[in-house]
Curated annotation (Swiss-Prot):
Naturally occurring in which organism (per UniProt): Mycolicibacterium paratuberculosis (strain ATCC BAA-968 / K-10) (Mycobacterium paratuberculosis)
Name of the coding gene: cobQ
Keywords recorded for this protein, A-Z: Cobalamin biosynthesis, Glutamine amidotransferase
InterPro entries, alphabetized: Class_I_gatase-like (IPR029062), CobQ/CobB/MinD/ParA_Nub-bd_dom (IPR002586), CobQ_GATase1 (IPR033949), CobQ_synth (IPR004459), GATase_3 (IPR011698), P-loop_NTPase (IPR027417)
GO molecular function, one term: ABC-type vitamin B12 transporter activity
Protein family (similarity comment): Belongs to the CobB/CobQ family. CobQ subfamily.
Function of the protein: Catalyzes amidations at positions B, D, E, and G on adenosylcobyrinic A,C-diamide. NH(2) groups are provided by glutamine, and one molecule of ATP is hydrogenolyzed for each amidation.
Recorded metabolic or biological pathway in which this protein acts: Cofactor biosynthesis; adenosylcobalamin biosynthesis
Span of the signal peptide: none
GO term, biological process aspect, one: cobalamin biosynthetic process
One Pfam family hit: CbiA
Stated name of the protein: Cobyric acid synthase
Domain GATase cobBQ-type residues, every copy: 257-431
Gene3D superfamilies on file: 3.40.50.880, P-loop containing nucleotide triphosphate hydrolases
Residue positions of the active site: 338 (nucleophile), 423
């Protein structure tokens, strides 16, 4: 077995990342040397690699599915939106510059050569490379500069599987329409379809799939059921916006639920940090955006942000800053992670990310933050595992450290207010359980932690994704596409008959 294929989608959050992760785990279990690849990702959920670079978190979890350490090779271009018009451009793990949609186009030829070279090297090294597209190939206004969808498929002669989310409605039109708007050369690369998140009896869908085959000349390789217990790290903000409650919480082992309000910031980054909390029995994590949502919370979490100063201003405008301050004044726990930690401090000097200069923070921690042009990218392994991705650094501090790692003080704490630049800290099981007991005591809750192993649960979820594909996908037909796109008719020809 050798080759590569591309998993594209009818939209963002259609299920591309899950299908790629499932295929990587399925192949790895068969002893196939497989690697994930996403030429260009736009996401503020990122991870630090073995090289000390930064990639999309989805590619990090896909690497785990394949039994590999995350590497910048798996996601050579990462765009991190900082506003509606600008993004931070990360090339092979390192920050290059801030770009607009217009200025980014100027880099297209150089970046296209880079991603094609990376994919070629991976194909030489691995038996199979499972590529993931970005957004939807139906965005034909972007086709001339596309690096991740049909642009990559055409350059590398990849067969393309098109995944659609039927839970949103209108899927058959989405699948047909996506193929229909492509030019004939791109149409020829679309090998077939995968239906994702189907509820009910698949037999009811068959007449529609037969009609889809008749008008496109393309098969549907599988119908994946809606799996509400499937828990994989979310890639983009659509996943956060779609679910008010994180995960499917198990009932408490003690007398009380522990209620967590995670603030849904406009430029949220690494929203996955709160998912470890949602793994614990008796912990209910909700995404919130109104002051009233904070009132009954035992713990408030301000997650990371790609635009710390702008999101801090948003907190104030919505009245959330006052609600969080009142929550802390009552002695109830607050946690800030990365950008959220910076917001908790007394003063922020940002002449890098926003150019706002000196800005007052919430003042819940007696410390100052200064932004630096050089981004801190660091992985920690022992005794606690975590990673850092930030421009802001503590420039003055009058608080106690929260915890130590490698004999270095990390994070800050004042009473029941906690802050850290670390992502992934709550994935440490013993640390998380002990801290939740401390949080529950401060909140007056009778909470008993469970024995959840987050790493084992994450691997079990990857196995579940692979099992779903094995049971509901024509895996042999899909793997046959690794050799290249099979002949498929032009849609216009089919429709004129």
């Amino acid at each position: 077995m050798s080759g590569a294929l591309l998993v594209a989608g009818t939209s963002s959050d259609a299920g591309k990342s899950v299908v790629v992760a499932g295929l990587c785990r399925l192949l790895a279990r068969r002893g196939v040397r497989v690697a994930p690849f996403k030429a260009q990702n736009m996401s503020n959920n990122s991870a630090v690699t073995v090289e000390g670079g930064e990639i999309g978190r989805a590619q990090a979890i896909q690497a785990r599915a394949a039994g590999l350490e995350p590497s910048v090779r798996f996601n050579p271009i990462l765009l991190k939106p900082g506003s509606d018009r600008t993004s931070q451009l990360v090339i092979k793990g390192q920050v290059a510059e801030s770009v607009t949609a217009t200025s980014y186009v100027q880099h297209r030829d150089r970046l296209a050569a880079l991603v094609l070279n990376e994919l070629t090297c991976l194909r030489d090294e691995f038996d199979a490379v499972i590529c993931e597209g970005a957004g939807s190939p139906a965005e034909i206004n972007l086709r001339a500069t596309d690096l991740a969808n049909m642009g990559l498929a055409r350059a590398a002669d990849l067969a393309v599987i098109l995944v659609g989310d039927i839970d949103r409605g209108g899927l058959l039109a989405h699948l047909f329409g996506t193929v229909a708007v492509l030019d004939p050369q791109d149409q020829a690369l679309i090998a077939g379809f995968v239906v994702n998140k189907f509820r009910g009896d698949p037999a009811l869908l068959q007449p529609g799939l037969r009609r889809l085959h008749d008008i496109t000349g393309r098969p549907t390789y599988g119908v994946l059921p809606y799996a509400d217990r499937l828990w994989l790290d979310a890639e983009d903000s659509l996943s956060v916006l779609a679910h008010r409650v994180v995960g499917a919480p198990d009932p408490p082992l003690g007398d009380d639920w522990l209620r967590v309000a995670a603030v849904r910031l406009p430029r949220i980054s690494n929203s996955t940090d709160v998912e470890a909390l949602a793994c614990e029995p008796g912990v209910l994590v909700r995404w919130v955006s109104e002051p009233s949502d904070v009132a009954d919370a035992d713990l408030v979490v301000i997650p990371g942000s790609k635009a710390t100063v702008a999101d801090l201003s948003w907190l104030r405008e919505r009245g959330l800053a006052a609600a969080i301050t009142a929550h802390a004044a009552a002695g109830r726990p607050v946690l800030g992670i990365c950008g959220g930690f910076q917001m908790l401090c007394r003063r922020i000097d940002d002449r890098v990310e926003s150019g706002a200069g000196e800005v007052a923070g919430l003042g819940l921690l007696d410390a100052d933050i200064a932004f630096h042009p050089a981004k801190t990218l660091r992985r920690w392994q022992r005794p606690l595992a975590g990673y850092e991705i930030h421009h802001g650094r503590v420039s003055r501090c009058a608080e106690h450290s929260w915890f130590d790692s490698d004999a270095e003080p990390q994070g800050l704490v004042r009473g029941a207010v906690f802050g850290t630049h670390w992502h992934g800290l709550l994935d440490n099981d013993d640390f998380r359980r002990a801290w939740l007991v401390r949080v529950a005591d401060a909140a007056g809750r009778r909470f008993v932690p469970g024995d959840t192993d987050v790493a084992a649960r994450r691997d079990a979820q990857l196995d579940l994704a692979a099992d779903l594909l094995a049971a509901h996908l024509d895996v042999d037909a899909v793997l046959g596409l690794l050799d290249g796109p099979p002949p498929r008719p032009r849609l216009a020809t089919r429709l004129c008959r």
